[in-house]
Every structure is written in C-alpha cells, then in structure tokens.
Amino acid sequence: MNIKEMAHTSHAGLVITSLDEGDVTALTSDYLLNQLHTHGYLILRGFRHSIADFSERVRSTSSRISLDPARSFDGDTAQKVDAGYDKVGLHCENGNSPFWPDLCWFYCQKAPTQGSQTTVCDGKAVYEHMNAAQRAAFTSQDIVYSRRVDEKKWKTYALHALAGQPGAPTTIDDITLEHLYAVAQSDVGMRIDKLDDGAIRYSFQTPAIIGSRLNTKETHNFANSIFGPSNNYETPVITFADGSPIPDTLLAEMDDLCESLTVDVGWQQGDIVLIDNTRVMHGRRRIEDKDRTIFNALSYV
C-alpha cells in the first residue's frame, strides 16, 4: 500500500493519504493506534470507501462497540450523525456520562459543498495555553454532570451495549439497573438513582483535565463536555463537585481559548476520522449543506 503522512496542524492531527485508493481495512490496528498516541486524531483520506469498509475498520481496531439507540443505525457499528443543523459545541463523545468510549470515529459518505464542517480541538494544546488561574480552577476540584434519562432510553442503551456478550439479556423487559452498571466504566465517580416512573437520574463526577487512556504519557488534557450538546437527551446540570456553578467568566475564557485552537477537519468524500476521545474534543460548524452525510461510531480499544 502506498501512503503519505502529513501533519494536519502544527500541534496535533495526522492526515494519512492513500496514493492508490488502497484498502483502509488493510492498515494495521497497531499502526493506527501508535499514530493516534502521538497525534491525537487521524484523517484517513483517499482510500476505497463504503459503510461496510468503515464498519470493518472500526470493528478490527476495537474490543467493543458503543451504540446510542437514540440515533439511526446503519448495520451494527455505524450510526448517522443527525444532530440538527445548529452549531455543536466542543465535547468528548459521551463525556458527560459514565459511558465514555476511548475512540470516536467519523466517516464522510458525502462531503459538504460549503461550511458544515466537523471541528477538532486538541485538549493537550488547550491545557498548555491555559493560564495559572484557569488551571487552578479546574484542578482544585472535579466537575459533575447530572440528568434524568427516561426508562426506555436507559434500558435500550444497556440492551445494545451488552449485545453479543455471554448471557446478555435479549429483550428490553429483561434489563435491570445492574445491567446498566455493568456497562459503565468501573473507575468513575457515578451515582444512579431510580425514579418512581422507571426513569433514572445519574450523576457523573470527573476531572475537566484528564489523562489520555490511549497514551499514559499525555496526563493533562482539557478534554470534557462542558460546552457540549445534549441531542436526544435532557440537558445535564453541570457544576463543580462542591455544587457551585462554573462561573460564566471562566466558561467564556475557556470557550475563547478552545476556539482559538479549533480547526476544521476539511471533509473530503470518503474521509475517515479517528479521534482519541480522551484527549481531543470535537464539535461542528452550523450546517449549511443539508445534503452532507456523515456517519459516526464509538468504541473501546
């Protein structure tokens, strides 16, 4: 296979281009993950592409797939990005919940003709540019996300997350709260309360500045979901761990800093983007081309 590697920005990202329309599934997982360790996100460009190729690429690099049942499916791996047309703030995918995957993938089946770009922001670079007061504010205590989730949504999520595992429940009626705990990260600060109507309210405590799960040397990344969306779910309440709100002035400062380090993917037809979801945040410019078609997948190494 004939490929060319080129930096996407001066501080993060790598574009891996096939010069002969090669098979994207022929790239080894070790090669991709090693490059991801260094660069934070990858853009695979110029390869032969289809939903089937994308799904196979995701499965071969992952130990487990995470599906959001609130989105539309294309097979058992890819889901269509359908989060309306407005701008989407920077976030780690599912970073406001204890179901936070390692890897975030995108596949561009049809590139936008104008605007409508997915954006990326390297949390490592953000941390390096934070001033002492900003670092102190976010390292002195964790942040907490809390919200209510309807019974059907949390049970459907658990059903999909456990699918294929030995002894997994086969219908939504078999799902219990223990099943939901089973698919959460075991090392997170999580509390789940079941409500009278079968819904749950969860709280998830996590640092705003975290270490990458993929590269243990990258210990300080401003990677979180304090600016992120809540499509298909109730908007979470976001506070510091002591219950105090994050000051508007601090949020505005961080928003400006992150925006200064945010870049567009620059979609081309057939692109696949792979993101370290514990280092690099992503978002979206306002949709101007409603015919663009992007698929997403979430997974664990």
Regions inferred by a protein language model and the residue ranges of each:
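A gly/proline- and charged-residue-enriched helix-loop-helix capping module
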Residues: 66-92
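Catalytic micro-motifs at enzyme active sites that drive phosphoryl/nucleotidyl and oxygen chemistry
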Residues: 31-32, 89-97
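Short, acidic/polar
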Residues: 24-33
